Amino acid sequence: MAGGEPLKNAPADNCANMGFSFLTGADDMGFYRNVLTSYTQAMFDSLQLAHPLSADKQPLFRHRINLVPGKQHHIDYRPTTPWLKQFSRNPYPKTVLWEDFDMDGRHRSGFYNLQVLARPSDNRTNYEMNINGNHVDLRISDVKYTTVQKDPQWGIEMKFYRDYSEATGGKVRLYLCEQLVDLSKPVEITINGKKVFSGKVKASLQSMVSSCAEYFDPCRVYPAYIDLAY
């Protein structure tokens, strides 16, 4: 990327489990791109401190965000590919962070091994999943944004405060595979601290067909799923 974006439009949480490169000209002042990039850098640094490692002991927020001295909107993109090529995709992270939000009237229907069957409200929803052994812990919250800084000329929303409250009334499908849990043993699932499932999860052809139709991803054809209401 070469220009900052208000974080309400691109929550940094959704960039966990990947390498993220973001270079912007230090003098790229159009639409406050340089300022917004500095806010993005601060957010990634904060998330890295709050979540240094995933449940499977992997760095969660690997990022390189810099303002390039003396540059405006035109920058040299050549350093990006050598930096990114050191990372490999992990389709089965044991920690997932996801802020589900409206994008021009549409929502994603799923993220990694989660599929939303019913949203808890019209608000944004934050999902945090951690898998330790055969215990899956889900934290699901409603997210409310409050704008704390606006540009005085165009009214661009620049900076935000996020308030979280426990979400209720939703339904989520949790897909599982051997890379995430031991399917030969019982699985325990908690949502917002409450046990919602305990027992063995049965593999089925239906799960494979359903996940294939949902994700269109050969790495995410899951043998089992559980539907969970909260």
What residue spans do the PLM features occupy?
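Alpha/beta-hydrolase-fold catalytic nucleophile elbow
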Residues: 1-2, 23, 69
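Alpha-helical scaffolding within the catalytic cores
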Residues: 3-13
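Acidic catalytic loop of the alpha/beta-hydrolase fold
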Residues: 6, 26-35
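Extracellular/periplasmic catalytic domains that process cell-envelope and extracellular macromolecules
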Residues: 13-16, 57-59
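Short beta-strand/loop motif that positions the catalytic acidic residue
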Residues: 15, 21-25
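Membrane-proximal bilayer-interacting regions
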Residues: 16, 34-38
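Short, well-ordered loop/turn elements at secondary-structure boundaries
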Residues: 16-17, 132
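Alpha/beta-hydrolase-fold serine-hydrolase catalytic core, especially in secreted/extracellular enzymes
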Residues: 41, 45-230
